[in-house]
From Swiss-Prot:
CDD domains: CYP503A1-like. The gene is ausR. Its main location: membrane. This is Cytochrome P450 monooxygenase ausR. It is found in: Membrane. Cytochrome P450 monooxygenase; part of the gene cluster that mediates the biosynthesis of calidodehydroaustin, a fungal meroterpenoid. The first step of the pathway is the synthesis of 3,5-dimethylorsellinic acid by the polyketide synthase ausA. 3,5-dimethylorsellinic acid is then prenylated by the polyprenyl transferase ausN. Further epoxidation by the FAD-dependent monooxygenase ausM and cyclization by the probable terpene cyclase ausL lead to the formation of protoaustinoid A. GO terms for molecular function: heme binding; iron ion binding; monooxygenase activity; oxidoreductase activity, acting on paired donors, with incorporation or reduction of molecular oxygen. It comes from the Eukaryota. Belongs to the cytochrome P450 family. It is a single-pass membrane protein. The chain crosses the membrane at residues 15-35. In A.calidoustus, the austinoid gene cluster lies on a contiguous DNA region, while clusters from E.nidulans and P.brasilianum are split in their respective genomes. Genetic rearrangements provoked variability among the clusters and E.nidulans produces the least number of austionoid derivatives with the end products austinol and dehydroaustinol, while P.brasilianum can produce until acetoxydehydroaustin, and A.calidoustus produces the highest number of identified derivatives. Keywords: Heme, Iron, Membrane, Metal-binding, Monooxygenase, Oxidoreductase, Transmembrane, Transmembrane helix.
Amino acid sequence: MLRLMHPFSAQPNEGVGLYILWTVAVLFVIFKLLAPAKCDLPTVNGRRRFEIGQYQARRRFALDGRGIILNGLRKARAFRVVSQKGPKIILGPEFADEVKSHPACNADVFIAKEFHAHVSGFEVLRPQQVMKDAIRLKLTRSIGVLMKPMSAETALILETQWGNSDCWHELDLKSTIASLVSRVSAVMFVGEELGRDQKWLSIVTNYSSDMFVADLDLCKWPEALRPIATYFLSSCGKLRRHIREAALMLDPILSERYSAPHNKHNFLDWFEEVAGGRKYNPVLAQLSLAAAAIDTTSDLIIQTLTDICRFRDSGKLQQDLREEMVRVLRADGWEKSAMYNLKLLDSVLKETQRVKPVVVFGMGRYVTEQMTLHDGTVIPQGETINVVNTRVWDSAVYPNPLEWDPYRFVRRRDSGDHAAHLVSPTPDHMGFGLGKHSCPGRFFAATKIKILLCHILLKYDVKISDEASSTVVSSGNFLFPDATLSFCVRRRQDNLTIWG
């Protein structure tokens, strides 16, 4: 975590080969410094006097990315920043609708370039149409079938990991939620045998976290040298090892499934069904699913529980949530209609995602040909652009925007605002992106999160110690929950039989 938050604290020192690469890199940087800029947009955190290169500018962004972005928006609606991953063009939220549908804005190319998909160890992040089709055609349509298995798995995990003691006991919130999310996801993705295997869970969880560290390490190198540098960086070597170990575990299961008839509802079958003869790598696809499913889902659950516990009238809010859960689940059971009718829980989640989104800017796109925005701003071909998600803190859109109001979106929903649903992205709230490239798995993610929180809040009393103070941790473009909070739980005595 410390390396992720402070990626410039460690200097590359990983073998003689690195010295050769650094020599080439210095020459490359000199060439880049002498080359003319592609675009005349202002840079809001560029090099200061007597600084050579972008090291200090990148470091400043790592320490206060949100502040730099907000300061830039006060000066211009389109500008450059020097981020940990290099220069970026940042656009104000008024450009969101334009960017989401512009033919020159390519999301797949952006992802491939942004996350080094051509580099060994990062193949997991190559855009795969087969995976998108499996999510859209199979996963989303099968949510109703998966709800009871997800509920059963959640109950089993909580029984084992959180226990039945009616005395308050402390949990490491970050690790326990990550464990819960990764296992429930894995059982749905690869089945019970592999999904409950601790070694598999360790691989998929560690690949996701190690990828962020390796990404920042690799970004210290010029783009042209990254396919070589990856073989000299131990952080990148970890990714390749995770892929090899995942293949060793998954290949025998795939061979067995292909040779014997079965009737299962998970991605091992869905990938094969939707592929239609197209080539794909099931190991990379599974790691890609895990990377998408674990971190952001865990983040939202952790922050939501934190917000609930820190709310000024937490006792009443928890009671309101439990009453809604009991009423809805007794009426509907684990059906899709229940997820729709959990209106307060939906509002709580959307409000948490509003006050503390995962990122300050998103909607990354690669510009395939020169484009002119509605205000006349010209973006050259070959640039990467991002749109800020800062309307979530705009008082013109959300009254008292810095206040966490769990009932905010219930009121909006009751007044007829269809965009008040958690899974409905808009330029005012881009927690799941926007347009055709918005998160395709958001319906599954929202369902999974609600199931997990129903189990947690109906079965356990939760609190944060009185002396604890919650602080959102900012690192570059990312906003992380406070992982240092003391989170305590105890088993509730209500004997609710609503899990059928």
